[in-house]
Curated annotation (Swiss-Prot):
Keywords: Cytoplasm, Elongation factor, Protein biosynthesis. Belongs to the EF-Ts family. It is found in: Cytoplasm. Residues 80-83 are annotated as: Involved in Mg(2+) ion dislocation from EF-Tu. Pfam families: EF_TS. It comes from the Bacteria. One of its GO terms (cellular component) is cytoplasm. Associates with the EF-Tu.GDP complex and induces the exchange of GDP to GTP. It remains bound to the aminoacyl-tRNA.EF-Tu.GTP complex up to the GTP hydrolysis stage on the ribosome. Gene3D superfamilies: 1.10.286.20, DNA helicase RuvA subunit, C-terminal domain, Elongation factor Ts, dimerisation domain. This is Elongation factor Ts. GO terms for molecular function: translation elongation factor activity.
């Protein structure tokens, strides 16, 4: 069996908040498998829901841009946060994000595009930038949303300059309604997404393997109560509904008012904008996704900004 190092125990503690000895026992019982150890702790009631954290230690910038019926979001990483304040780096991220309006989520295709005004490709310009600034940099990911009729709204939380910052969000709303009112709705939903961190648009979009894993953990937790199996299954279904409310955007409670589900917010908006509204997609890129950042109350902060 692999030796359980202090670093592994520390990582598990940071992910779960469980005690040091419990973390060591969990890792011992699971032969050092981090994911299995998280589940072991949860089944024993010693940890909160698993958090994907700590594995990516990236700085840099996230960029967003919107066209009339499309939007793009890109994350470009560097080694230190100092680079994010470099005007040349900011200009690079902004231009690359605009190019992603055409290339979408294909980073390889994005890197092969001509970089405006240089005679170089994006990849070549990035190499040039690395040599100039002296830090390693990578285009980590890109995404694009579009609508046939309606708008794609953007939101940037913790922006250093317009459309560049630490958390970028896109929201696609299909509707023939009033564009200005749609933009207002889109902005508020985008701010909600920044705070609430949904993982899927609708229940049907939830990763089946992740859902099955969650069910297994919830079932073991419920059985620990000693109740009959049919009661256990009802408890599990209730907890699965709660899980959906945590990770599915349309099932989440709107952080702006604290009571209405996003599904209902979108449905009600049809009356305001003058035509039915459908939320067809979203993107949320957080810089160095998974790193736990100290913040007083992010959801409350976004809600106050939106209100």
């Amino acid at each position: 069996m692999a030796e359980i190092s202090a670093a592994l125990v520390k990582e598990l503690r940071e992910k779960t908040g469980a005690g040091m000895m419990d973390c060591k026992k969990a890792l011992t019982e699971t032969s050092g498998d981090m994911e299995a150890a998280v589940d072991w702790l949860r089944k024993k009631g010693l940890a909160a829901a698993a958090k994907k954290s700590g594995r990516v230690a990236a700085e840099g910038l996230v960029g967003v841009v919107a066209a009339p019926t499309a939007g793009a979001c890109v994350e470009v990483n560097a080694e230190t946060d100092f680079v994010a304040r470099n005007e040349t780096f900011q200009n690079f991220v902004a231009k690359v994000t605009e190019l992603a309006l055409t290339t979408g989520d294909d980073v390889e295709k994005l890197q092969s595009q001509p970089f405006p005004g240089t005679g170089r490709t994006v990849a070549e310009e990035l190499t040039h930038l690395v040599a100039t600034i002296g830090e390693n940099m990578t285009i980590r990911r890109a995404a694009r949303l579009s609508v046939t009729q309606g708008i794609v709204s953007t939101y940037m939380h913790s922006s250093l300059v317009p459309n560049l910052g630490k958390i970028g969000v896109l929201v696609a709303l299909e509707s023939a309604g009033d564009q200005a009112k749609l933009q207002e709705l889109g902005k508020q939903i985008a701010m909600h997404i920044a705070a609430a961190r949904p993982e899927a648009l609708d229940i049907a979009d939830v990763d089946p393997s992740k859902l099955n894993r969650e069910r297994d953990v919830l079932a073991d937790q419920a059985r620990a109560s000693g109740k009959p199996e049919e009661i256990v299954q009802k408890m599990v279904e209730g907890r699965v509904r709660k899980y959906y409310e945590e990770v599915v955007l349309l099932e989440q409670v709107f952080v702006v008012d604290g009571e209405t589900k996003i599904r209902k917010v979108v449905e009600n908006a049809g009356k305001t904008v003058g035509a039915p509204v459908k939320l067809t997609g979203f993107v949320r890129f957080a810089l160095g996704e998974g790193i736990e950042k100290a913040t007083s109350d992010f959801a409350a902060e976004v809600a106050s900004m939106a209100g």
